[in-house]
Amino acid sequence: DPSNDVETGEYSYIGDISVKVDDWGKIPAVMGVREFYGGDLQGVMDKLDYLQELGVDVIYLNPVFVSPSNHKYDCQDYDHIDPHIGKIVEDCDGLLSPGDRDNSHALKYIRRVTDKRNLKASNELFRELVEEIHRRGMKVILDGVFNHCGSFNKWMDRERIYENQEGYEKGAYISADSPYRSFFCFQDQNRWPYNPTYDGWWTHDTLPKLNYEGSEELCRTILDVGRKWVSPPYNVDGWRLDVAADLGHSNDFNHHFWKEFRKAVKEANPDAVILAEHYGNPESWLLGDEWDTVMNYDAFMEPVTWFLTGMEKHSDEYREDLYGNSEAFIGAMKHHMRSLHMGALYGAMNELSNHDHSRF
């Protein structure tokens, strides 16, 4: 659907403007997070018969909620599908002027992502997509990015997108009186209005770290998000949890939260899968009361890639000693499979490659 395409100059992200790429064959830039090639949910809908013919059983979608980046791991609104991949029914002019990087002037972007009619229409299109996926006997898993959100998020609103929009509360960046202030940790309590001293995940100011221990309301809100999308009318079949072990500020709280998340999701949809991104030993999360399983890096992706190509996924280093080395391959598989209980092993996401690593 070309009517929802991100426009060049629609808004600014990490110091430069959004770019609509017209040449499908263009190689993405190294920092190509603001480049958009026009894909959307309608495009997925149009390809469902093809995917079914390929024998696809499950479609795992990278984040689909409102976000300024093309990867969308910096969520702006957990309750709504991004109209840029959904449906835009209310639009306007208002691209940024040349040289302007102030997103409070990005009137077109603001209309597209804050107008409730666009958000409602996009959620409805997503509902239709899930219905069509299920009608073909396939499943769909959403990506849940709950460790951090984005600086554009309406709870933070560093870009002042929601500041003057009817129906939205003040973001925590905007005002010390924001209802979302406790959702984040601020280092300087005397910098409001427009307080930039919030904690970012790995110090990234575009990825504000969510402060679960300091906000019961935040915990309730994210549990509600977990329930919402696996429940009618959306009926998604599960969650893939981004950097799941990083959530919270302590290991004890992390386990506590995922136990509560599991209860919320399974009460809403007992068959929903809870699949975590995790590097290292996941045993303590796989005791039956937190995650169901994991993305299988250690006991599949890494050893298979070493054996067949000699490439180490994380560093892209070529390891001639591992290329075709059956002893190293079998040893790695056996060693890491011991960390997965039988149910988790059978249900693990076994990938040759994904968005976080070099392609196979």
State each model region's role.
Residues V56, P233-V236:
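A structural motif
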Residues D1-K139, N147-C149, K154, W201-H204, ...:
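N-terminal structural segment of carbohydrate-active enzymes
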Residues L51, L61, Y78, I133, ...:
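Conserved, mostly hydrophobic/aromatic
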Residues V130, H134-R136, N147-H148, F152-N190, ...:
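Active-site-proximal helices and loops of the catalytic beta/alpha 8
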Residues D1, Y60-N62, I141-V145, D242-A244, ...:
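A cross-family glycoside hydrolase active-site/sugar-binding cleft signature
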Residues H204-P208, D242-L247, G343-F360:
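Active-site clefts of carbohydrate-active enzymes
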